């Protein structure tokens, strides 16, 4: 058996050189575009969600409802704290006194002397207006804090508002 050589392959023959006129006459060679892939890859189908990793539709629904309920309860509580001192509503169930205040002046004074309302009505309305306006700044600062921060961060403003409302309720 003859031995085979494992040396380098024989050199290739060089192509004959073309003259400038022949090179200009031939059109340039174009390469064929690469063949398109025969199989288009598709995304794998979504896998089924294992139990416990996602709460699902009803879990999300219950969670949202709980959040709305808690938010509503906190909002109503804050609203009643802010407006409770001004509207006269509170936890007591005593009926409101709707009687007209009695004037200490005699009825012999003509009504034109003091206007359309007796003097005692002017005094009581001035006090209630003053009470409403006295705590307005505290209520606004508390409301601004609630809008920008957590409820727990606004406890200082809540205490100031409660103190103001208590002070004015004792003076009336």
Swiss-Prot record:
Top-rank taxon of the source lineage equals Eukaryota
Where is there biased composition of kind Low complexity? 14-29
Q: Name one GO biological process term.
A: mitochondrion organization
Q: Which GO terms describe its cellular component?
A: cytosol; mitochondrial intermembrane space; mitochondrion; nucleus
Ranges for the region named Disordered are: 1-54, 82-111
Biased amino acid composition, Polar residues: 89-109
Q: Which InterPro entries match?
A: CHCHD2/10-like, Cys_alpha_HP_mot_SF
Report biased composition (Pro residues) as residue ranges.
Answer: 30-47
Q: What is this protein called?
A: Uncharacterized protein C6C3.02c
């Amino acid at each position: 058996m003859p031995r085979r050589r494992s040396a380098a392959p024989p050199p290739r023959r060089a192509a004959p050189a073309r003259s400038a006129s022949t090179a200009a006459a031939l059109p340039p060679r174009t390469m064929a575009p690469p063949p398109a892939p025969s199989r288009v890859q598709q995304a794998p189908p979504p896998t089924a969600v294992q139990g416990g990793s996602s709460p699902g539709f009803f879990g999300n629904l219950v969670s949202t409802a709980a959040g709305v309920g808690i938010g509503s309860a906190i909002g109503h509580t804050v609203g009643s704290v802010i407006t409770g001192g001004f509207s006269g509503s509170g936890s007591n169930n005593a009926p409101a006194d709707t009687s007209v205040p009695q004037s200490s002046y005699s009825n012999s004074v003509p009504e034109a002397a003091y206007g359309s309302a007796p003097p005692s009505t002017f005094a009581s309305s001035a006090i209630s207006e003053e009470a409403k306006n006295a705590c307005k700044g505290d209520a606004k600062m508390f409301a601004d804090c609630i809008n920008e921060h957590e409820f727990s961060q606004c406890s200082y403003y809540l205490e100031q508002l409660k103190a103001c409302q208590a002070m004015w309720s004792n003076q009336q």
